Swiss-Prot record:
This is NADH-quinone oxidoreductase subunit C/D. The gene is nuoC. It comes from Rhodopseudomonas palustris (strain BisB18). In the N-terminal section; belongs to the complex I 30 kDa subunit family. Pfam families: Complex1_30kDa, Complex1_49kDa. Residues 1-172 are annotated as: NADH dehydrogenase I subunit C. PANTHER family: NADH-QUINONE OXIDOREDUCTASE SUBUNIT C_D, NADH-UBIQUINONE OXIDOREDUCTASE 49 KDA SUBUNIT.
Length: 581
C-alpha cells in the first residue's frame, strides 16, 4: 500500500475526522485530524490496519501563535503531532491536531501506545497541553514548582530576559519538599501481601545511574516490586535554543544532545535543513561524514563496553578500552581539530577537507582494533561472572520494545534487525557493505553482544571509506550552503555582501517542515524542524532514543534485584543529556 492509498483508506474510514493532508519535505504523509478522533485513529493504525504501525516514534507540540506562513493548514493555536512507524511497510505517517491557544486539550493515547505517557507529560510541561483521560499531569523536565510553560512563544528564551533568580530559604524548602517522594502520586505500592515495602531513592547521585537521574523504587528486600524513573535534572532547553540560534549557529548544540555521539548528532539536524533548502551534499562530503560517524560509534561502544564490564564487577577492561578510545580521538582531532564535540559538519558539506596524512592515521586505527576486540572477547564476553550477571537479565521481546519506543541495539537484541542505515539508507550508506548484528533473547547480554559486533561492522565501513574515498568538492554548490564558499565572494561588491550576510546572519531557509532521521549510537535520533522563512528555526523538535528507553524501566525493572538493575541500566546505554535535552 502506497502513501496515497494509506491516506485514502484513512479518509474513507474516518470521514470528516481526517480533513486534510499537509505538504512537507518528508517522504511520508502528514494528515490533519480532529482531536476527538485521536484515540480511534491511533488504535486503528496500531491494531486493526493490515501491516500496522506498532511504533510511536514521537509526540510533540508546536505553538503556532507567532507563525506567519501556515498556508494549506487549518487554524491552530497549538498543534499536537504524533509520528508513527511501520517496520513491515518501511513507512511512516504523521497525524496532527489543531488545538486552541488559550486552553489546549487533546485526548491521551497512552493506553494504545504506552510510551506516549512521557511525551504527553512533556507536551503539558513545555506547552500546557492537557490530555483527557490521563491520571495526572505532572511536569517531567522542569522543576515541579516552575511557573509557566517554557516552549510557548510568550516565554523568554534567555535567562537575561527573566527576572533575577533568588533562592530564598523558604523557596529552597518548598523546592526540596516538592521533590520528596509521594508514593500515591507516583502510583507506587507501599505494601505487598501485608508486608510494608521500602521506598528507596535510587539516585540522582548514584554512580550506577550514569548521570543525574533518579529511580524511585518500591522494594521487598532486594526485589524490585515497582520502579518510577524521574528525569529532568539535566534539562538545558535545547529545543528552545533552536528558536534563537541561526540555522548555522545551532550545529554545535546538536553535538551536545548526545555528548558521546559527536558529529553523529549533527547528521539528522543537517538532513532536515538540507531537505528544506533542496541541497544535495557532494559524494566526498557524504563519505567523510559516514567515516566520522562510524568512528564515533566505535568511541561510544567502547565506553559502553568498558563501563558495563565495570558495572558487573570487572575493573580492568574500562582502562584498556580508554586506551583504544584515545587512539580513535587522535584520528578525530587530526581531522576536525576537536575531540568529543567537533561541530564540523556544515549545511551542504563540511567545515574543511581531510588533512594531509589522514589516511595513515585511519589505517593505523583500523589495524589496531581487531586484535584488541579479540582480547576483550575472552576478558568480558566469555567471562563467567559477566555472563552470570547479564544472561537472562532484564529480557524483553520485540513487541515490548515497540510498545516503549525502543530502537537501536536495544531493539536489535530482541531479534528485530531494523537499522536505519540498511532499511532507509541515508547520506550515502547505500554504497557500503555491512551486516546488522542481532540477538535473540533481548537480555543484558544480547544488548552487549549487539554493540560489540557493531564495532566490527563500523570498522568494516571505515575501511571502505578509506579504500574508496572519492575526489571532489566538500561543499555543495548551492546558494544556501553555509558558510558560502569564498570563491563565490571574490567577484564584486554584490557577491561580497551576500557572503557577509550568509556568514554573519546565516541563511534564510525556505518556509516548510522537514524531518531528519539517523541510526545514532543509541537508536533512532530524529530532528523535525519548522521554518517560517527566517534565519532561525520556528520550531526544532529533537526525538532522542534515550528518552524513550528510560521510560521502559517502569515495566522491565519489576522482578529484578537491585544488583540486576545495575546491569540493566548499564545495558541500556543512555546518556542523560540525550534524555533531558
Amino acid at each position: 500500500m502506497s502513501a496515497v492509498e494509506l491516506v485514502n483508506e484513512l479518509s474513507a474510514r474516518f470521514g470528516e475526522a481526517v480533513f486534510g493532508e499537509q505538504p512537507t519535505h518528508d517522504a511520508f504523509p502528514t494528515l490533519w485530524i480532529k482531536p476527538e478522533a485521536m484515540p480511534a485513529l491511533h488504535r486503528y493504525l496500531k491494531h486493526e490496519i493490515e501491516r500496522p504501525f506498532p511504533l510511536l516514534v514521537d509526540l510533540w507540540a508546536i505553538d503556532e501563535t507567532a507563525r506567519h506562513h501556515r498556508e494549506g493548514q487549518p487554524p491552530s493555536g497549538v498543534t499536537i503531532a504524533s509520528h508513527l512507524m511501520s517496520l513491515e511497510r518501511n513507512a511512516d505517517i504523521r497525524l496532527k491536531c489543531a488545538l486552541p491557544a488559550d486552553d489546549p486539550r487533546a485526548h491521551t493515547i497512552a493506553e494504545i501506545y504506552p510510551n506516549a505517557d512521557w511525551y504527553e507529560r512533556e507536551a503539558f510541561d513545555m506547552f500546557g497541553v492537557h490530555f483527557e483521560g490521563r491520571r495526572d499531569h505532572r511536569r517531567i523536565l522542569m522543576p515541579p514548582l516552575w511557573d509557566g510553560h517554557p516552549m510557548r512563544k510568550d516565554q523568554p528564551a534567555r535567562a537575561t530576559e527573566r527576572p533575577p533568580f533568588v533562592m530564598t530559604a523558604a523557596r529552597f524548602d518548598a523546592e526540596e519538599q516538592a521533590l520528596a517522594v509521594d508514593p500515591e502520586a507516583l502510583g507506587l505500592p507501599t505494601q505487598r501481601d501485608g508486608v510494608e515495602l521500602m521506598i528507596l531513592n535510587y539516585g540522582p547521585h548514584s554512580m550506577a545511574t550514569h548521570g543525574v537521574f533518579r529511580i524511585v523504587l518500591a522494594l521487598d528486600g532486594e526485589e524490585i516490586v515497582a520502579a518510577r524513573p524521574d528525569i529532568g535534572f539535566h534539562h538545558r532547553g535545547a529545543e528552545k535554543m533552536g528558536e534563537r540560534q541561526s540555522w548555522h549557529q545551532y550545529i554545535p548544540y546538536t553535538d551536545r544532545i548526545d555528548y558521546l555521539g559527536g558529529v553523529m548528532g549533527e547528521m539528522p539536524y543537517l538532513q532536515a535543513v538540507e531537505r528544506l533548502c533542496g541541497i544535495a551534499v557532494p559524494e566526498r562530503a557524504q563519505t567523510v561524514r559516514i567515516m566520522l560517524c562510524e568512528i564515533f560509534r566505535i568511541m561510544n561502544h567502547l565506553l559502553f563496553y568498558g563501563t558495563l564490564a565495570q558495572d558487573t564487577g570487572a575493573m580492568s577492561p574500562v582502562f584498556y578500552m580508554f586506551t583504544d578510545r584515545e587512539r580513535g580521538y587522535r584520528v578525530i582531532e587530526a581531522i576536525t581539530g576537536a575531540r568529543m564535540h567537533p561541530g564540523w559538519f556544515r549545511i551542504g558539506g563540511l567545515a574543511a577537507d581531510l588533512p594531509e596524512g589522514w589516511d595513515a592515521l585511519v589505517r593505523d586505527f583500523l589495524d589496531w582494533m581487531p586484535a584488541r576486540l579479540d582480547d576483550y572477547e575472552g576478558m568480558v564476553m566469555r567471562n563467567e561472572i559477566f555472563r552470570a550477571r547479564t544472561v537472562g537479565i532484564a529480557a524483553y521481546d520485540t513487541a515490548t520494545a515497540f510498545d516503549w519506543g525502543i530502537t537501536g541495539p536495544g531493539l536489535r537484541a530482541t531479534g528485530c534487525g531494523w537499522d536505519m542505515r540498511k532499511a532507509r539508507p541515508y547520506g550515502g550508506y547505500q554504497n557500503f557493505e555491512f551486516e546488522v548484528p542481532t540477538g535473540h533473547r533481548g537480555d543484558c547480554y544480547d544488548r552487549a553482544r549487539v554493540r560489540v559486533d557493531e564495532i566490527r561492522q563500523s570498522l568494516r565501513i571505515i575501511r571502505q571509506c578509506l579504500d574508496h574515498m572519492p575526489a571532489g568538492p566538500i561543499k555543495a554548490d548551492h546558494p544556501l550552503t553555509t558558510p558560502p564558499p569564498r570563491e563565490r565572494m571574490l567577484h564584486d561588491i554584490e557577491t561580497m555582501i551576500h557572503h557577509f550576510v550568509g556568514s554573519s546572519w546565516g541563511p534564510v531557509v525556505p518556509v516548510g517542515e522537514a524531518t531528519g532521521q539517523v541510526e545514532s549510537v543509541r537508536g533512532l535520533t530524529q530532528y523535525a524542524v519548522v521554518s517560517d522563512g527566517e534565519t532561525t528555526a520556528y520550531r526544532t523538535r529533537i526525538r532522542t532514543p534515550s528518552f524513550a528507553h528510560l521510560q521502559s524501566i517502569a515495566t522491565i525493572a519489576p522482578g529484578l534485584t537491585v544488583a540486576d538493575l545495575v546491569a540493566y541500566l548499564g545495558s541500556i546505554d543512555y546518556v542523560m543529556s540525550d534524555v533531558d535535552r
